[in-house]
Amino acid sequence: MKIHTLFAAIFLLFIVTACYEDKGNYEYREMNDIEITVEMEDKHPSYALGDVVTCTPKLTFALGQESTNLDYEWSFAGKKISHTRNLEWVADTVANDKALQLAVLDKNTGVTYFGHIYITVSSKYAADGWVVLSEKDGNSTLAFIRHVSGFNTPSVAVRDVYQMINGHPMGTGPMSVYPHWTSSWGGEEEASWLWVAQKGGQGALDVSGSTYQQKATLSQIFLKQTYPEGFVPAAVMDLQILSLAIGEDGTIYTRVKETNKLFNTGRFIDRPLTSDAKGEVKVDGSMIAYTRFDYQAGLLCYDKNSAQYLHIGDYVDYDSGETRVGKALPLKVDEGDYKEGDAKLNDMRNHKVHFVGASSKGTDFTMSYMAVIENQTTGKFYLQKFTVEAYDGKMSAVPTKFESQEEMVGLGNVINGSAKNSFALCNYQEQAPYMFISKDNMLYLYYMSNSTLYPCAQFESNITSMNVNIYYNRCLMVGLENGDVVILKGIRSADGEPNLDRYVINGGNTIQVTDAENDFVLFHEKDFGRVVQVFYRWNMSWNEYFY
């Protein structure tokens, strides 16, 4: 009986639903969806507080015709900043690598569409740009020139920023300046700090890159809170865990930091770094191929005391936290790599190394290097090319591939023993196959593609320092003895821009850098004092990627 009743109920329910008439009024239409593209000239835009951030988004409509009833809302780091389609915003919020987002509301449908790009806004000084160390009126001075991309003119040039912030001169006898960082994960500060080496005053100083306040003095970080006897600081280079204090005579003293999350922990020992098992042969640190790469686990050094290239280890195991640092390791080269007459990397006797630099990021954490060497018997100059694997913390010699040695014809007229020479190697050799070499006030360009040396530019004073910026290697900064600082463009150019290939290499012309306007001069200012060192400071990351 219950079964019959159940069937009857189901049958009645079917009849009722079958007789129901849906009188709803539905309108079906195709959605005009919006695809939003938010792009800027640089892939990793970086701004300082007070900068004007502009962006013209690209809106693509699914039906090919733009909707008219739209609302716009821009936000950065979760803060609403504008309600216009095209953004023009004075940056007022400090944030690192946060989304600059555009939300577009179609009021006809109630649907909101989104597009974004990640940007960084930092303090006035915690930004990408050039650092200039110079000597003016007998004092060491630091200047900061903010310059994010290689196409635009630098937006801020702050002179003698150390004295302006700290209220007193930095010191005397400037020697060098190098940036250093803490870990990207929970480090003391995102911005890099600067080790400034100088002979007088307080000696070598550590300065915050975001405020330019003095943070430490090198002498106080030695075990005895004073320099070892005879030590005169020429450079301080901080790696992940290992720190190098390099003397004017090339002697290296080391410190092993307790963590890479803080800028200064641990103390320098008074025993010099050595390369032999007995600890008797001191490593000479006068020529180090300085790079900003933690994955290489150290730095390459040419040690003239042992006449060989060495890898100074700085290995950190990020899983276990284990460190293996502070050893000067030889390179392991297959003898079959060499041709007859090639100088061997672990036996450079009878050769003088004038320069060694990192040329590009290789594959599988290898690093490519180029060195300018001179055969002291024949007087001929050569370009050495070799690739070094990353140090894994266990190897006793670092595997290395010797690539080639080619004669640099004509370089003997540039490096003659009496002229002042500076060097700058473009990191991104695939697109900028150049090495810049100066002789007094003349700048030369060595073109890797045809192994030829070209006169490139003439200045009104001797060149004292050069450096190439990292953003696509677009610019070369040149510091002069008379206090001028010049940024040359044209290394890698946008369409229609001046180009070194066309003007110098193909045209046979030499750029004349004077006070007059010049298509190749992006920036030219005077009165910085005698320039000691210039370099491009990439603000917020250890790893300097070669774009």
Model-derived features: positions:
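Positively charged n-region of N-terminal signal peptides that target proteins for export
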Residues: 1-10
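Preference for solvent-exposed, low-hydrophobicity sequence contexts
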Residues: 187-417, 423, 489, 499, ...
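Acidic/polar, low-complexity intrinsically disordered N-terminal segments immediately downstream
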Residues: 20-164, 473, 481-547
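Short loop/turn segments immediately following the C-termini of beta-strands
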Residues: 60-62, 135-137, 147, 197-201, ...
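C-terminal motif of bacterial Sec signal peptides marking the signal peptidase cleavage site
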Residues: 15-18
